[in-house]
Curated annotation (Swiss-Prot):
Changing E42K: In LCA7; uncertain significance. It comes from Homo sapiens (Human). GO terms for molecular function: chromatin binding; DNA-binding transcription activator activity; DNA-binding transcription activator activity, RNA polymerase II-specific; DNA-binding transcription factor activity; DNA-binding transcription factor activity, RNA polymerase II-specific; leucine zipper domain binding; nuclear receptor binding; RNA polymerase II cis-regulatory region sequence-specific DNA binding. Changing R41W: In CORD2; exhibits reduced DNA binding, transcriptional synergy and interaction with NRL. This is Cone-rod homeobox protein. The keyword Iron-sulfur does not apply. Its main location: nucleus. Residues 97-114 have a biased composition (Low complexity).
Amino acid sequence: MMAYMNPGPHYSVNALALSGPSVDLMHQAVPYPSAPRKQRRERTTFTRSQLEELEALFAKTQYPDVYAREEVALKINLPESRVQVWFKNRRAKCRQQRQQQKQQQQPPGGQAKARPAKRKAGTSPRPSTDVCPDPLGISDSYSPPLPGPSGSPTTAVATVSIWSPASESPLPEAQRAGLVASGPSLTSAPYAMTYAPASAFCSSPSAYGSPSSYFSGLDPYLSPMVPQLGGPALSPLSGPSVGPSLAQSPTSLSGQSYGAYSPVDSLEFKDPTGTWKFTYNPMDPLDYKDQSAWKFQIL
C-alpha cells in the first residue's frame, strides 16, 4: 500500500520538471525561470610600474599592434585584453584634452560664430520673369535699313540677281523696263511654242516681248482663266512685280493683265486636223540634229 502513496517519478516537459499528477507549474501565473544575472567585471587597478610601461608604449604609438600589447601584458602581468581596453580609454582621454585646449585658446566670443544676415524675399530687387527677354536684342539694338529709291541700282540687283547668272552684270533701268511683257505680243502666236536658250531668258530683255519668248507657250493655258476669275487675268510678269519692288498687295496686282481676252486664246483648236509644230532653235543647249523629232501629229 505504501508504494502507491509515494509520488511517481519526475517528468520533464519543455525542460520543466513536473512532479506526478501536479500540474501547477503549467499555470499561467507561474513564470518561467529567468537567466542568472551576469556579474559585473571588477575594475582593474594599475600600479605605478604598470602605468609607466603603458605610458611609455603610448608615447611611441597610440595604436599598438597585438604583438606589442602581448609583450607589455607579459611585463606588467596583466591579460592582453586589459591592455587593449586601457589604450582605448587613453585615446579617448587624449582627444578630450585636445578639445579642452582648443576651447581655452579661443576667445569668449569666438564660440558663437556670427551668422550672415538672411536676406528677406521682398527687399532684394530681383529681375521680373513675367516678360520673356528678347534673345536677339531686336527691340533695343536692331534698326531696319532704310528703303532705297525705287530706281536705285541696288534694288535692281536684289531683284534680278536671283534669276540671272553670276557672270552677267546687273540690268540697267532701261533693260528692266523691257522685262514687262506686252499683251499683244504674248497673244499673237498662241499655238507656236519656241524653246529659246537659257541665257536669253536671263539677259535678253527682248525675249519677253517677242513671239518667240519663253513664256509665249504658256499663254494658251493662262488666258482661259479670265472668265472664271470674273475680271482681268493676273500676270506674273506684269508691271512692277518684276520691277523695283516685289512687295505689292494682291489688290494692286488684280488690275494688271496680259491684255484683252480673245477667243483665239482658248485651248480649242480651230482646225482639228492641224498639227502643233515646235520651232527648233539652233541655240538650244539640247543638241538634236534631227528636226523631225520636234513634229508630232495630233490624233
